[in-house]
Amino acid sequence: LAAHTLPSARSQGGPLTGRVNPPEGAYFTGVVAGDVEQQFVVASDAGYGFVTSLRDMVTKNKAGKALVSVSKGGIAMQPVSIYDLDHEFLAAFTNEGRLLIFPVRDLPVMARGKGIKIINIPPSRLAERVEMMSHVVVFSEVDTLQISSGKRSLSLKIDELEHYRGERARRGLKLPKGFQRVDKVERIRGDE
């Protein structure tokens, strides 16, 4: 949708379904805006994902278009902005408190599809929905990741995150006790 066609901030807004016609049972997991060349990580909670541009998300079809293929029972996640594909990192968290960090450039650039494995989740645990990818964050070396668990938060800089760095599609390592139930992850930009 062109942003200038949306209701102004003075109004009550309006439902997205008034402007698009999603298939039966479909729902929105996120909204993105930006330049057509802006890149995003698109992923599912099954632990798969890829990099795509806003240009590949745009369609003239009111019913939309298929962008990400999700495993049965899986859920597409909110797309995450990439500012520098060659120098940023991807942090993948599971609901079991595992964290894996690797360069975001390790993901393929695709127009649509399932993508490749970001973090390894045992198939039996994934099928039963016991374990899944819960958060994806893209960050740079100067940024800090703030991990919130309940009322507590933990801020980690790049040198503290080195412990969780590994190859894409690995299992990831457990976060410290007390922070394994991750409610929210925030990128605190270091260049501001």
Which residues does each predicted region cover?
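Short, structured "edge-of-domain" segments at secondary-structure transitions
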Residues: L1-E192
